[in-house]
């Protein structure tokens, strides 16, 4: 929020250096970001009047001007500008003058003709057409103000103000106004506050004969006020008003629009003006938008509305998006004759959601969404009407329409002086506290504080204590050391993720971090069918672009995209992992399910299915998880048929591992085979075993037997291992696959699978007969699959 010190002086007079002012306001809770004293870089530049012009004898594009600068004799200035005419008032930089950017002007000769200064453009004065819309970008700045010849240009065009920039927190919307900051200034310096009560004469008639207002949603619109002005004269605003708007960073447009902006800055109450002839049947309806309804806003954009949005409509269609922006159709035009001024109080959360969904944030919405005071509507509307009469911009029709459903009861907050002293660590009497609250217009009655309507942030004792502290002075509160300690606690789930990280790094993998946003086209790249459930994604309302328009439901595209980047940067091999989140929409819920997963990907070097499978098994072992079973699946569209398996522990499917489908690899531009594993971290945590227990080293020797069998090509080795383990029983210490062979003399459609079995008993040395019997049990159990011993 920019504050013009000249504007502030209208409400409270502060006679103190600007640096001290900024320090005092900051220490009282209104943080100052900085300040700018206008015109400090401009020196010895005055208003000049062009008396005569003649062409330069040695140039076809330069002119010799005789300029009256308020001295006894005119000065001669040579210029190359083509827009200067006799009688023009212009900024004249005289000999030894200074301009922004460290430029110094001295007299000299231009192609043999003496020039005693320079006629200045906007740019040379450090200004733009934003400051003076009537001026041109290229050429001399021709003044349209009523200026005195020889007057300092800074005074002539209003560059003699000091502008202070405040950082206003979201809980103080009242300070997004000149009056709000004037209240803070008066309270800080204990000075009287001079608030002006608007006076409107009126030109007769009755507003109710011209306009009808109906509020259908009183929850979202607590108060709606309207007034009518007829016979308006759209023109440029007077200089003083334009200077104040410019100082606060608002571009002057015309008197009607400028009045609404002026009142918004002065009162903090957004205003809007409608052209009455475009309000059908003279009827304004405050209602929710209809499904599929659209409006073309003042910026020329067609916007689609939804039923939760509040609009200001006439008898047929919306005229404005409540609290955000007006409609182009009903805006002020050159032929506008009668207007409606609107001053309303809309629910902050509704305005915020509407502005966010439409992707447009305005000065108006920024104020409404913080929550405004319904009691401020009347003063702001009357001030706008007063300015209309003051500027001669139109005739105010008598009366105003006021649809008021707001609760005007002032909030009462408990007041406890002893509690506040303990809370703040100070020692003030009750009377001193009451006295410190009085400049803030907070009245103490008994054990309660009566809070002004514009201070919606004061809700409890701690809030009142803060007001006492800032009026007492934060710098006066003694510094005390903090007592007590807080210890950070790592949850079991967080520790589990740390162990996963450590295990993956120990196995030589590099961690990656990717965005949770992605493009819908990624689903096409991983070959998901159009009706696949994983395509149901959370859609971002206002994305940065299509590439970040949805939340991912699978971490596979992010992993493959990173593998592709490594491959395209000629990295011969990549071993990557990521602990990421997948976002799954939930029926009837606003927020999605956020699922933590471990994605592991690799290509090149020794990467293959069994290497990645070994990584997964090693990880499960390090995490003290049960051994997982692998079940081949050939239907996943993103993986190679027959080279993809899901992992289960008991009945719980904890993840998958597989080779990426060649088509998917081609879509990502990966020119080699790649493998990806996915593990659900929450399920891993759920199936983990109790803390590991340790046993003494075995006292008896082990016996190793190799077992080679012939089975169907389609039979998973996991089924063989599970059968052997169950048949041999607890004397089987370890089973390890060491060979898979296809080809002669093994029959076609068959494969040879060889295991190494380590047998050991805890209480004795196994005999040869016991070992042979164990192998026989295994073969008998395997026979159910048609498995035979390889000769």
Regions found by a protein language model. Name each.
Residues 2, 439-442, 457, 586-599, ...:
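A carboxyl-terminal module marker
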Residues 189-215, 392-420, 427:
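Terminal amphipathic helices with adjacent charged low-complexity linkers/tails
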């Amino acid at each position: 929020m920019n504050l013009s010190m000249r504007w502030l002086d209208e409400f409270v007079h502060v006679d103190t250096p600007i640096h001290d002012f900024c320090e005092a306001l900051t220490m009282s809770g209104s943080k100052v970001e900085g300040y700018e004293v206008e015109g400090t870089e401009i020196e010895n530049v005055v208003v000049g009047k062009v008396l005569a012009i003649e062409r330069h004898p040695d140039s076809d594009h330069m002119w010799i001007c005789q300029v009256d600068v308020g001295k006894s004799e005119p000065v001669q200035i040579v210029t190359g500008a083509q827009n200067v005419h006799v009688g023009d008032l212009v900024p004249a930089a005289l000999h030894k003058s200074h301009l922004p950017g460290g430029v110094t002007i001295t007299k000299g000769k231009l192609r043999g003709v003496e020039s005693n200064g320079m006629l200045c453009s906007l740019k040379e004065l450090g200004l733009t057409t934003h400051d003076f819309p009537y001026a041109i970008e290229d050429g001399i700045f021709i003044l349209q103000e009523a200026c005195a010849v020889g007057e300092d240009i800074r005074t002539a065009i209003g560059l003699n103000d000091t502008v202070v920039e405040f950082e206003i927190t979201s809980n103080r919307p009242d300070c997004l106004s000149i009056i709000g900051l004037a209240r803070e200034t008066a309270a800080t310096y204990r000075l009287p506050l001079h608030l002006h009560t608007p006076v409107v004469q009126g030109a007769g008639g009755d507003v109710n004969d011209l306009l009808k207002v109906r509020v259908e949603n009183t929850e979202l619109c607590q108060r709606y006020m309207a007034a009518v002005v007829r016979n308006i004269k759209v023109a440029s605003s007077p200089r003083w008003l334009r200077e104040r708007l410019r100082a606060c960073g608002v571009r002057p447009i015309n008197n009607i629009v400028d009045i609404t902006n002026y009142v918004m800055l002065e009162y903090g109450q957004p205003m809007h003006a409608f052209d009455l002839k475009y309000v059908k049947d003279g009827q304004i309806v405050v209602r929710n938008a209809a499904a599929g309804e659209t409006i073309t806003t003042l910026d020329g954009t067609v916007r689609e509305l939804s039923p939760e949005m509040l609009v200001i409509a006439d008898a047929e269609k919306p005229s404005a998006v409540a609290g955000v922006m007006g409609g182009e159709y009903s805006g002020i035009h050159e032929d506008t004759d009668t207007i409606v001024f609107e001053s309303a109080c809309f629910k902050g959360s509704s305005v915020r959601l509407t502005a966010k969904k439409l992707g447009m944030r305005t000065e108006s919405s920024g104020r409404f969404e913080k929550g405004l005071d319904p009691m401020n509507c009347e003063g702001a509307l009357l001030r706008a009407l007063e300015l209309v009469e003051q500027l001669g911009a139109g005739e105010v029709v008598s009366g105003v329409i006021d649809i008021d459903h707001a609760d005007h009861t002032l909030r009462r907050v408990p007041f406890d002086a002893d509690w506040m002293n303990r809370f703040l660590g100070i020692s003030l009497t009750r009377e001193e506290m009451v006295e410190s609250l009085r400049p803030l217009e907070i009245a103490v009655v008994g054990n309660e504080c009566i809070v002004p309507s514009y201070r919606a942030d004061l809700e409890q004792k701690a809030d009142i204590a803060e007001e006492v502290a800032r009026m007492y002075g934060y710098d006066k509160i003694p510094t005390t050391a903090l007592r007590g300690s807080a210890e950070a606690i790592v949850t079991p789930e967080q520790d589990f993720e740390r162990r996963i990280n450590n295990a993956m790094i120990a196995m030589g993998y590099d961690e990656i971090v990717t965005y949770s946003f992605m493009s819908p086209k990624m689903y096409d790249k991983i070959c998901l069918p159009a009706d696949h459930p994983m395509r149901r994604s959370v859609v971002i309302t206002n994305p940065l672009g299509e590439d970040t328009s949805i939340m991912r439901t699978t971490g596979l595209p992010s992993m493959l995209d990173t593998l592709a980047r490594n491959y395209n940067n000629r990295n011969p091999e990549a071993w990557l992992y990521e602990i990421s989140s997948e976002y799954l929409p939930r029926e009837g819920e606003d927020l999605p399910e956020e699922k933590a997963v471990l994605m592991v990907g690799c290509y090149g070097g020794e990467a293959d299915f069994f290497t990645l499978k070994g990584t997964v098994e090693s990880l499960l072992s390090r995490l003290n998880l049960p051994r997982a079973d692998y079940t081949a699946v050939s239907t996943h569209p993103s993986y190679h048929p027959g080279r993809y398996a899901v992992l289960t522990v008991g009945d719980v499917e904890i993840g998958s591992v597989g080779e990426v489908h060649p088509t998917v690899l081609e879509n990502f531009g990966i020119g080699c085979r790649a493998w990806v594993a996915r593990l659900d971290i929450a399920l891993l945590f759920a199936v983990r075993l109790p803390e590991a227990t340790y046993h003494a080293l075995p006292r008896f020797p082990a016996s190793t037997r190799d077992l080679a069998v012939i089975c169907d090509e389609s039979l998973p080795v996991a089924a063989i291992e599970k059968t052997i383990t169950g048949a041999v029983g607890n004397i089987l210490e370890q089973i390890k696959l060491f060979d898979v062979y296809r080809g002669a003399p093994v029959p076609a459609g068959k494969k040879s699978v060889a295991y190494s079995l380590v047998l050991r008993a805890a209480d004795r040395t196994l005999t040869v007969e016991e070992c042979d019997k164990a192998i026989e049990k295994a073969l008998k159990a395997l026979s159910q699959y048609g498995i035979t011993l390889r000769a």
